[in-house]
Curated annotation (Swiss-Prot):
InterPro entries: NADH_DH_suC (IPR010218), NADH_DH_suCD (IPR023062), NADH_Q_OxRdtase_suD (IPR001135), NADH_quin_OxRdtase_su_C/D-like (IPR037232), NADH_UbQ_OxRdtase_30kDa_su (IPR001268), NADH_UbQ_OxRdtase_49kDa_CS (IPR014029), NDH1_su_D/H (IPR022885), NiFe-Hase_large (IPR029014). HAMAP family: NDH1_NuoCD_1, NDH1_NuoD. One of its GO terms (cellular component) is plasma membrane. This is NADH-quinone oxidoreductase subunit C/D. Transmembrane segments: none annotated. PANTHER family: NADH-QUINONE OXIDOREDUCTASE SUBUNIT C_D (PTHR11993:SF45), NADH-UBIQUINONE OXIDOREDUCTASE 49 KDA SUBUNIT (PTHR11993). GO terms for molecular function: NAD binding; NADH dehydrogenase (ubiquinone) activity; NADH:ubiquinone reductase (non-electrogenic) activity; quinone binding. The lineage of its organism: Bacteria, Pseudomonadati, Pseudomonadota, Gammaproteobacteria, Alteromonadales. It catalyses: a quinone + NADH + 5 H(+)(in) = a quinol + NAD(+) + 4 H(+)(out). The gene is nuoC. It comes from Shewanella oneidensis (strain ATCC 700550 / JCM 31522 / CIP 106686 / LMG 19005 / NCIMB 14063 / MR-1). Residues 1-191 are annotated as: NADH dehydrogenase I subunit C. Keywords: Cell inner membrane, Cell membrane, Membrane, Multifunctional enzyme, NAD, Quinone, Translocase, Transport, Ubiquinone.
Amino acid sequence: MKLTRDFPHNDTMAQWQPSDHKDAKVVGELFAHFGAEHFTVQTTRTGVPVVWLPRELLQDVVGFLRKLPAPFVMLYDLSATDERLRSHRDGLPQSDFTVFYHLISIDRNADVMLKVALAESDLHLPTITNHFPNANWYEREVWDLMGITFDGHPHLTRIMMPKSWQGHPLRKDYPARATEFDPFMLDAAKQDMEQENLLFKPEEWGLARGNENEDYMFLNLGPNHPSAHGAFRLVLQLDGEEVRNCVPDIGYHHRGAEKMGERQSWHSYIPYTDRVEYLGGVMNNLPYVLAVEKLAGIKVPQRVDMIRVMMAELFRIQSHLLFLGTYIQDVGAMTPVFFTFTDRQHIYTIIEAITGARMHPAWFRIGGVAHDLPKGWQRLVQDNLLSWLPKRLMDYEKAAMRNSILRGRTIGVAAYTTEQALAWGTTGAGLRATGLNFDVRKWRPYSGYEQFDFEVPVGSNGDAYDRATVRIEEIRQSMRIIEQCMNNMPEGPFKADHPLTTPPPKERTLQHIETLINHFLQVSWGPVMPAAESFQMIEATKGINSYYLTSDGSTMSYRTRIRTPSFAHLQQIPSVIKGSMVSDLIVYLGSIDFVMSDVDR
């Protein structure tokens, strides 16, 4: 493993002002190759070019972007929006449903978002799984939740909802509250049908039941298996102990997080973000509030930025400690997990003193944080973290990471290359373990990360061992960042002085009756955000997490798209583990570091 300091910092990614990005290089390349008349470039607050194109050009455009001199090698996200009730669409192509494709070029450190408009009477698009293998699950999700068909898809079936589910939940005409449904009844016939739907049929997935000499065993790992790390089912095609193939089955933890965003105010949705990746705490608040602040045009004080960075890094450390303990436990050592949980308690002592809560503080606010840092917070950080954890990390490395059994179980196991990681949309430590130092905090700084001195650890083999060593070193780098926050915390307010800061600063509410009325409306009804689209990605605990928000000039989001890293990471499993032993699969699952709430949302 090595530490890297040189990064292709992209200043344009930090700009949130409305822009059509027509001057972006990729837009010029598309115009030159296909003709400008085929495209509509949209003005947004996303910070990336957003280009509408006709359905007939989708395959050609995606293939063209894949083959450019500095190609767009990662399909970062793919989803859709039901446009039928949207009011503010001036200058955009007529569309009932819009499918969007978010592509990333590592060489350019640049993105482009492609949009295709569809009429309700013809909801068909060609699959792009021939260009990006990870489009498979994203297209299944769009069909499941929006009802859009992708012609040529290898297996277009439900992925979040049960097979028997009726309707497509993210459509605007689909109920958003449980009280809008008929009462749920489960009679014997329906129970039998649901049990039958859970039966795995290999032929449906193109898997053989055996060869001319022997039959394969099909084994369910999960959805209630301790090594599955949550409600996750993995159907294994086994030849003895060898995994010939496998089919991940997700959706058991799906809660409709994106649908909830359409019926909560911009402010009241913050607690829901905590629970998208339930180990990340305020790390989950960060991309959401940053995206909302882009919509509102809020620039927060420097003190707010530094407080947010410090709290995010505290949650990164406690998440990585949990990973370390459970990962070593998966390999077979039982003791370290008790030590890592003890160390996490030290982190929670700091978090609880600052926020008043532990795992789910919901502490970040639109325009700031809930309240200022308490007196004596520096001593808490010093005693419970900076004076404690460095020695513990050395103990973990000596006792566990240098242990011959752990090394034998993990080195060379579940390895993949940088190219394979990018093709499957892998981010975070899973990508950096292959040798690529792509860290959003360095490449696309947000919340003032460009002011901090820290390094990005990378591996070289892309195996289960490197993924663990990268995270251990990331803990050290997070401590460096936190120490800089402690030593350089600026004075100033903990909220921005802006009309859309929610809740508004107290001094704005105690002047006369109008200020009290505005305060009442903003807190009870919710702030009204300008009609626009915004996007924000961050380097979260498991990889890159982002929110893509669409405002229609209301108190609630018109569309809340949550892109989580774990969804992409689980889709990669079959390509990595084929030909390995079942014991290697357990090691691989532990090295991914995922929670199912992050996958299923």
